[in-house]
Structures are given as structure tokens and as C-alpha cells.
Amino acid sequence: MIFHEVELSHTKEIMDSYEVNPIIAKYVEHRGFTKEDYEALNTPFYYNFTDLENGETALNLIKEACASKSKIHICIMSTELHHLLESAMIFLGVLMAKGKSAFEFFDGPRDNFGPGLHIILGNQLEVRDGDNVYPLVPGGHYKDEDVAQSLLVLQLINTLLGKENQYLASLAGIGIQAEEVPLRNSNRYHLKKTLGLLNDCRFDAIEFVALTPKTRQKNNMRQREFKKTYNESVMSGSITNKMAHYLSSLNNAKKMVKYLIYGCPGTGKFRSVAPIADEINAGYFISDEFHDDDRVRDVIPLEISDLSKTNIEEYLQVLSPFGNGQEKTPISIEGLVIHEAPVKDYFDHIKLSFFIPNVGGIDTIIYNPNYKIKQFKQGQKVKIVGTLSINDFTSLMTINAVQVDILD
């Protein structure tokens, strides 16, 4: 991978006009977003369906949109999936298609919706890629308008608001069940069929999520089954990597697996426990090919003074209402001084620690296997290329590095 630092000249102007921090301003300038684009990206229409108090309002809005055949933009923050019909599973699978700068789903002619998540409900559910049209229900088994809409509206929303919630899926956009979690055989078949459809479409990326059970159903049989699958996955480490490499191989030209997140059973929280978890948090699956190919990738240069936990959190919120979603443009930071002796993390990645006065600690995990820990020493000044995130467990700012240059 060849990294190219972009030239930015309007950062201060965008900061003042858009009222944003410098990291967001540089991202906005690089992407060429207008103020209208930025507002659409920063203020998506979404409801947290885990909050039952606003669930009825959200349900009514969606029903009204379907009844009037008007367009409605929705970001679904969390939902359970295992009760959905087989056709709804296919529906969720096909919705992994990723457009140039956003997810785009619509029932009419191709429009430029701008950045953000767009789920458009109308009289026919389909996704378009240029001149190609792919129905959300392969085979046309559900052509009736009301039935097709009910796949999302009735099955999904009724499940969200129901009393039988057992599994939750954290959705950055919309994903599908991992094949390793308990699924009926028929759903497994359709899942494979859906992945094949995505391969034919040659979309740029796949988003993939798995399930985690709610705490209060500790004795539920399906949860016990999930725990067994979860433990086997973590202990062997093979299922996660096999699925990641399988998805990554679907389109060798451009496609990269963006993330694969397993829930932590019994906690009600979402944890990245797979061996590739931190690469996934970085915004893309960093494979060996990622380091060795000769593609050129833009990099946004940041100053050390740009960094703060608040700035990074706001930046991640802009990328998606859930902190993930839009592909992250790598950033570069020059002049960081290694604060402590380098160490290896649990997954044998090199970990560098930095400390910035009035800001706090910054962890850096190096995902490029070409680096050796003996190259780095406490007190060295370095330049880093990678992506920004916030560690869910330590709350520290984190740089997921793919290139580290020693400056002295």
C-alpha cells in the first residue's frame, strides 16, 4: 500500500463555517462535502429501538412512510434477528451492499442521496447497482407489496418491541447473522445464496455482524447454544479467521472485510473478541495483501494539537451514528514520542504508548507484520499512518497503525 498525504488548505475556514473540530474539518475537506452533505452525515434520522419509550413513535413513522410510499431515511441502532422470517434474513443480507460514499437503498430511479445510511421503503424493495437491479427477496417469492413491506416493518419492529428479545445485534448500518451462530438449515442455505449474490454484484465492501444475547435470558436454550459456539470460536480462533478470509476472497479486486464483531454472552455488551478484532475496529480488515500491494491510498495529515478524546469521539460520530460504518480515511501524525517501552499485546501485535500533556495517553497498535519490536525504543520520535478509534475497555484514544516511520 502506498500512502499519499492530501493537501488541505481550507481547514480553518471549514472549522469556523461548519463549527467542527479540526479532525472533522480535514475529513470534510478531503471528502469534498458541502455543508448540506455534512449536516446530512452528522444528523441522520434514526431511533434507538432498545428504548421502548420511543418505539411506538418510530413504528408509526415507518408505517406512515410505507402507507404514503414516501421516502424515509432510518438508521437502526440495534435489533434482534433470529425471530425474523427466512426471507427477512435474505433482506438483511442483501442490504450489505455498499455504495460509493454510503449505503443506498431505494425503490425508484437512482438518486444521489449524499452521505449517510439510506433505507428507502416503497412499493418494491430492491437494491440497484448502476443499471443492475437486485430484488431484496431473491426468486420473487414475496411479490405482494404488503408482505414485502412487512418483512421490515412488522417482523423487525414487532420483534424489537416484543417481550421475547433474546439476542441483540449491534448494527453499524445493517448486517446479517454470522453463520456460526444458531441458524436453521434453511437460513444457512439462503445466507450462502445471499453471499453469492453479493459476490456477483462486486460491491466494494461487506459489513458483517454477529449476535449477543441479553443478560436476563441466562437460562435460555438458544443462549446456551450460542455460548457453546462462542467459546469454541474463541478457543480455536479458526472460525473467525476462516469467515474473514472467506469474505475477503469473494472479490479479490477491491473488497475488504470491514469488521466482524462477536458479542460477549451474558454481559449485554458488545465486545470484539476475535483475533482480528482490533484490525476490524480500525475500519477495515488489514490483510497481508493490504500491506504488500501497490495501491495508492489517501492520508489526512493531523497535527498533535488536533488530538483529543473529544475530537476523536466527535469524528467517529460523524463517520456513523455508531462509531463505525463509513470507511475511515487513514490519518498521519508526525512527532509523537514513545512514552513507554514497546510491548506485545494479547494477539502478538506491537503496542506503542504515547502521552500528550493536557490530552492524555494514546495507544498505538501496529498491524503491519513487517515491523519488529526491537526496532522501537522509549523516547523515539515517530510518524504514524493509521486510523483513529477509542478503546472500548480503557477509553484511551487509539491509533490503529499500518505504517510507522522512526524520525530519530
Language-model segments: residues:
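Mid-to-C-terminal polyanion-binding domains and interfaces
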Residues: 64, 70-71, 185, 189, ...
